[in-house]
């Protein structure tokens, strides 16, 4: 493997490494999935000299070099199976139907418990608000009342 100089340019999210003459590679993929184009030291010198004579920035020269180089981006759709457009249609008759019904039952029982807790808390608040007084009205509906 050849060595490279630490001159790295980032133009249009494309890393450009300036390699020495002994390196024969033209391009690599970076670990992050970005395309990297290797420019030989001679090409780098030509670009730099061209920059001095033409008055253009080195980054513009490298960008024009990249535009001339044929690059194509792969279409990821060809590597993945297509998804259905509506998930509600796929879940209606699926194997998860019983599980979803169980979850809905669990949620409804939770809501019932929350409602019961709210009613109990209101009754307790009313009880303490009335200075813990128990009226005879509480026992009106009781079946243990004495018959007169």
Curated annotation (Swiss-Prot):
GO terms for molecular function: cyclin-dependent protein serine/threonine kinase inhibitor activity. The keyword Nucleus does not apply. It comes from the Eukaryota. The keyword Cytoplasm applies. Its main location: cytoplasm. GO terms for cellular component: cytoplasm. Keywords: Cytoplasm, Phosphoprotein, Protein kinase inhibitor. Induction: Regulated by phosphate, probably through its PHO4-binding elements in the promoter. The modification Phosphoserine is found at residues 59, 86. One of its GO terms (biological process) is protein targeting to vacuole. It is found in: Cytoplasmic granule; Cytoplasm. Present with 2180 molecules/cell in log phase SD medium. Putative cyclin-dependent kinase (CDK) inhibitor necessary and sufficient for PHO pathway-dependent down-regulation of low-affinity phosphate transport. This is Putative cyclin-dependent kinase inhibitor SPL2. It comes from Saccharomyces cerevisiae (strain ATCC 204508 / S288c) (Baker's yeast).
